[in-house]
Amino acid sequence: MSFLKKSLLLVLFLGLVSHSVCKEEKRETEEENENEEENHEVGSEMKRYAFWYPNRDTEEKNENEEENQEEGSEMKRYAFGYPKREPEEENENEEENHEEGSEMKRYAFEVVGGEAKKMKREPEEENENEEENHEEGSEMKRYAFDVVGGEAKKMKREPEEENENEEENHEEGSEMKRYAFDVVGGEAKKMKREPEEENENEEENHEEGSEMKRYAFDVVGGEAKKM
């Protein structure tokens, strides 16, 4: 009996020891896992700080970024003297500013209500005035050159009269040329002989010249004298 008791006690003791050992191992394992997680977080934290990224959760980070963006835009607006306005108010104010700017431009160019004043005439009036100015300018030119009603004065003769005068001047000039060279009615005077007479005279002169040459060399009838 004593042996059995001792063996049971030993088994129980060994069971307790093994159970405690298992618990210890389990605890150590959990601690190791926790340490690994902590080390991982620490390592990631160190990396984030090394690259100037603070440790923040994703949601908080997004929220903070949005808040910072809004605050930054608000600071810019205050820095430039623009108070914070709601989007609807901003759109309304932009429309009002656009209308005011267009109104100012219209007044600056003396345009009210989209209708041009005397300073700016309508296209139709401008066309009419341009036509009137063109007519007035042509009328002034016509008076400047002594031309009234499209009819030329004595200062400027009509094309037909000019052509007639040109023909008369041409005839007078040809007549003067004919008188200058003693030619009247197309018939040459004694001063200028006709071509036929000139040819006859040339033949006579040629014969006389040949006769003179023959006498100069004492050759008569083509036969040499005793000389």
UniProtKB/Swiss-Prot annotation:
Keywords annotated in UniProt: Amidation, Amphibian defense peptide, Cleavage on pair of basic residues, D-amino acid, Endorphin, Opioid peptide, Repeat, Secreted, Signal
Region Disordered, residue ranges: 22-227
Tissues in which the protein is found: Expressed by the skin glands.
Span of the signal peptide: 1-20
Acidic residues compositional bias, start-end: 30-39, 62-72, 88-98, 124-134, 160-170, 196-206
Keyword Cytoplasm: no
Gene Ontology CC: one annotated term: extracellular region
Subcellular location: Secreted
InterPro entries reported in the protein's UniProt record: Frog_antimicrobial_propeptide
Basic and acidic residues composition-biased segments: 73-87, 99-108, 135-144, 171-180, 207-216
Residues with the D-alanine (Ala) modification: A50, A79, A108, A144, A180, A216
Single GO MF descriptor: opioid peptide activity
Pro-peptide region(s): 21-46, 57-75, 86-104, 115-140, 151-176, 187-212, 223-227
Modification type Glycine amide: residues: G113, G149, G185, G221
Glycosyltransferase as UniProt keyword: no
GO biological process: defense response; neuropeptide signaling pathway
Family: Belongs to the frog skin active peptide (FSAP) family. Dermorphin subfamily.
Summary of the function given for this chain in its UniProt record: Deltorphin is a heptapeptide with a very potent opiate-like activity. Has high affinity and selectivity for delta-type opioid receptors. The two dermorphin-like peptides have a similar affinity and selectivity for the mu opioid receptor as dermorphin.
Protein name in the entry: [D-Ala2]-deltorphins
